[in-house]
Design a protein with these regions (language model features):
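Catalytic cores of the polymerase beta-like nucleotidyltransferase superfamily
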Residues: 1-243
Length: 243
């Protein structure tokens, strides 16, 4: 990929070269390109991979069926795991064994909720939800940076309020936040944003969702690696927003 990009005069940035991923800059727009891969060993956080040539194996190592589609240069879609039907049904479903996919990288628990909040409709996939609950203890293995990045993406989705409510019922928020969460307050914040014409803001929504107790809030800021500005913004919103 690097060689062909150079031959075509396309800027290539080695954003994740150790994982086979580079970013190509075309007319000012970034496009991630990743070599086909197979999992060699998984650690519950990130996998050790080998590069390959098999599109089916590359698809089967991914998290959700809707993430495993591929398309040829002439527009033919290849679907090895039923992703096209799941897209049509607005359904987020793990590939193969949900428990095994989660054990490969526990961040997939958060991705399950984010993808449903962004692209899903109706009830969560029951098998996937049960596997997330069973594997929730693995969330403690994740770095704060990865949790923060994924949760910030989740909090600004169209279905964030419902997803967070289900996460709370499943016992995930206590692990992630380190204290009691207030999903109903997130509902209120989203309504307030809509009324005032404000764009979704992850820090503002986190403030509505999270903690009154200062010690808990400080642990959250440390655990999630919030910047000083983000931590101060979260705290200022907490004390202004009615619960």
């Amino acid at each position: 990929v690097v060689r062909r990009a150079a031959q075509a005069g396309i800027k290539c940035v080695p954003t994740g070269i150790e994982h086979g991923t580079v970013t190509l800059i075309v007319q000012g727009h970034p496009f991630e390109v990743t070599t086909l891969r197979e999992d060699v060993e998984t650690f519950g956080r990130k996998a050790k991979v080998a590069f390959g040539h098999d599109w089916r194996k590359d698809a089967e190592r991914r998290d959700f069926t809707i993430n495993a589609l591929s398309v040829t240069h002439d527009g033919i879609i290849h679907d090895y795991v039923g992703g096209f039907d799941d897209i049509a049904a607005a359904r987020v479903r793990f590939i193969g064994s949900a428990g095994q996919r989660i054990a490969e990288d526990y961040l997939r628990i958060l991705r399950f909720f984010r993808f449903h909040a962004a692209y899903g409709s109706g009830a969560f996939d029951a098998t996937g939800l049960a596997a997330c609950i069973a594997g929730r203890g693995g969330l403690s293995q994740l770095s704060g940076e990865r949790i923060r990045a994924e949760m910030f993406k989740l909090l600004v989705t169209k279905g964030a309020a419902h997803a967070v409510e289900v996460m709370s019922e499943a016992g995930l928020l206590l692990i992630l936040l380190g204290g009691v969460a207030l999903p109903h307050a997130l509902h209120g914040m989203i309504k307030a944003e809509d009324t005032l014409g404000l764009a979704p803001d992850p820090v503002r929504r986190l403030a509505a969702l999270s903690l009154f107790v200062r010690e808990d809030a400080e642990r959250l800021a440390s655990r999630w690696r919030l910047s000083n500005v983000e931590a101060r913004r979260r705290e200022s919103v907490v004390w202004r927003f009615p619960r």
